[in-house]
Regions:
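Rossmann-like NAD(P)H-binding beta-loop-alpha module
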Residues: 181-202
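N-terminal FAD-binding dinucleotide-binding subdomain shared by FAD-dependent oxidases/monooxygenases
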Residues: 2-10, 15, 20-158, 174, ...
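A compositional/structural signature marking long, glycine- and acidic/polar-rich segments
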Residues: 170-181
């Protein structure tokens, strides 16, 4: 590693799936060790440590929820629960020696770019001691995820309620819900998992849901030992299902078939009195569809009730619905979603112009980033799971690994190779790409007539990627260097790049590469025998390798 690379360091915020993937790539593929991950929770796992409510699990096939560098053939079933997924995240960190880079129970309060020293000053708080301090880094990576901070809902009278009230992501396990009257507000994936889970023990579960959802049968067979032995690869069949969200003849046909299938399933399981309330009046895909975890069946229970209304007021003892129906409850569960479109909440990030990231996004009328990763005026910053990177119906791990790969190519390798010391995307490139994305989203169901978490405060969809998951991979595979402003660096960067390539290869591959290079030079020499430039090339090559070797010591 070059002297300059040794001076580089990075801070990663978040030890969820994206942070783990970034740490692996830096440590084991770039052989770059000078990075630290700060995680506000007491361990790794991100959303799978945050969300521990009863019934919490994955709504995507488990084998699609595996890191490419740590394939897991041992998932117990098609859609696993939270404890098994969290254990997989912890095992991954242990297997690849990542824990030593991770500081838990430390929250990032914000960061500021210092142009004079080309460093980020990152403000941190130890949540165990309350001590606040700062650390400096050449590169700042946000891997905070999107399903961590609960939606900040405000209902009239919330402060009056004398029972227990909490969000699904802040589940209070100190509260015993056995034989209690429970209200569940919301009708997304979390609510669909919570209702059947708590209904087994509660005296009453009453759900408040203003609109319907597209439900599908949940394929969740238990895998045998033989099947687990046979699983070795991740297949991307689910990517094709995303076509149901596009305004193409194929997409419209697939969507109609999926909606018909969903209606048939709902009517076969849910009580007839709820059909009109459950079946949506918006197209499939406008909200994230739900693979039924037993929710529809639970509506047949005598202690479960669905009220298709909103909340007028919360009283000292319960809830008054929008039509005036009043009920008393012991517990109110807020299954009201997350601040998905409020990226990097609640950190205060200040860029090179002295303007905070959230203020800049207000001026842009919504969060935006070049290919979801880079933001103008914020040098040496990478956002993982940034604006418009969410896959419609594919693995979040595939999406975050794709973005990690792009951040490595577009930011870390140029800095390590000393191609530049500071890298910042051009505003023109960011605006051009953002406009193209929103134009593509315009006619998709993501922008349909429903209330969903894709749409931000300014009416823009700042979450969804408009194409197939693999199209984002194609789009980001080769960085477009014309989109960036670069400063600093060294004239030796091509030689440093060669040196890095060789240092990351196996001994056999290194020998093969050197022999191939020598053979190419010799062949070129034979073709232009007598031309002095060949000798210069050979001399320069030998001298370059010698210089790089000394520079790297």
């Amino acid at each position: 590693m070059s002297k300059y690379a040794k001076e580089l360091n990075a801070i990663i915020i978040g030890a969820g799936p994206a942070g783990i993937a970034m740490a692996y790539r830096l440590k084991h593929e770039l052989h770059f060790d000078d990075f630290t991950i700060y995680e506000k929770l007491d361990g790794v796992g991100g959303t799978w440590r945050t969300n521990t409510y009863p019934g919490c699990g994955c709504d995507l096939k488990s084998h699609l929820y595996s890191f490419s560098f740590n394939m897991n053939p041992n998932w117990s079933k098609e859609l696993c629960e939270q404890p098994e997924i969290l254990q997989y995240m912890e095992d991954t960190c242990s297997e690849f020696d990542l824990h030593k880079h991770i500081h838990t129970s430390v929250e990032c309060m914000g960061a500021r770019w210092h142009t004079d020293i080309s460093k980020w000053e990152v403000n941190l708080k130890d949540l165990q001691t309350g001590i606040e301090y700062s650390r400096y880094a050449s590169v700042l990576v946000s891997a905070v995820g999107a399903i961590s901070f609960p939606q900040d809902v405000k209902f009239s009278g919330m402060e009056k309620f004398k029972g227990h009230m909490f969000h699904t992501a802040r589940w209070d396990y100190g509260v015993d819900y056995k034989d209690k009257r429970i209200a569940v507000i919301g009708n997304g994936c979390s609510a669909a998992q919570v209702v059947p889970a708590v209904a087994k023990h509660a005296a009453l579960v009453k759900q408040y849901a203003r609109s319907g959802q597209w439900f599908h049968a949940r394929p969740n067979k238990q895998y045998s030992e033989t099947e687990r032995f046979m699983f070795r690869w991740i297949f991307l069949d689910a990517d094709e299902e995303t076509t149901t969200y596009f305004p193409t003849p194929k997409g419209l046909k697939a969507r109609a078939e999926a909606e018909a299938e969903s209606k048939k399933y709902i009517k076969s399981v849910a009580p007839k009195k709820y059909w009109d309330h459950i079946i949506p009046n918006f197209p499939l895909g406008c909200k994230r569809r739900i693979f039924d975890p037993g929710y529809l069946e639970s509506l047949n229970l005598s202690n479960v009730e669905l009220l298709p209304e909103g909340i007028k007021e919360i009283t000292e003892t319960g809830i008054i619905s929008s039509s005036g129906i009043e009920d008393d409850f012991d517990i109110i569960v807020l299954a009201t979603g997350f601040q998905v479109s409020q990226f990097l909440t609640p950190m205060h990030i200040v860029g090179s112009t002295g303007i905070s990231l959230h203020d800049q996004w207000k001026q842009c009328r919504g969060a935006q980033a070049y290919l979801g990763t880079h933001v103008h005026n914020f040098p040496n910053l990478a956002i993982l799971f940034g604006p418009n990177t969410f896959p419609a119906n594919n693995s979040a791990l595939f999406a975050c690994e794709t973005q990690v790969d792009y951040a490595i190519k577009s930011l870390f390798t140029p800095l390590i190779d000393h191609k530049a010391a500071v890298i910042e995307v051009k505003q023109s490139a960011e605006d051009r790409e953002t406009n193209a994305i929103h134009k593509s989203l315009r006619d998709t169901v993501f922008s349909g007539d429903c209330s969903n978490w894709y749409i931000g405060d300014y009416g823009r969809n700042a979450a969804s990627w408009p194409g197939l998951a693999r199209s984002f991979w194609f789009k980001t595979y080769f960085p477009d260097w014309s989109a960036f402003n670069m400063s600093g660096g060294s004239a030796l960067w091509p030689l440093l790049t060669i040196r890095r390539w060789l240092s990351t290869m196996s001994p056999i591959s290194t020998v093969f590469a050197l022999v191939s290079l020598a053979a190419a030079v010799s062949r070129y020499r034979g073709l232009v025998e007598g031309v002095a430039i060949v000798g210069y090339l050979e001399t320069a090559l030998r001298a370059g390798i010698s210089i790089v070797s000394k520079f790297a010591q």
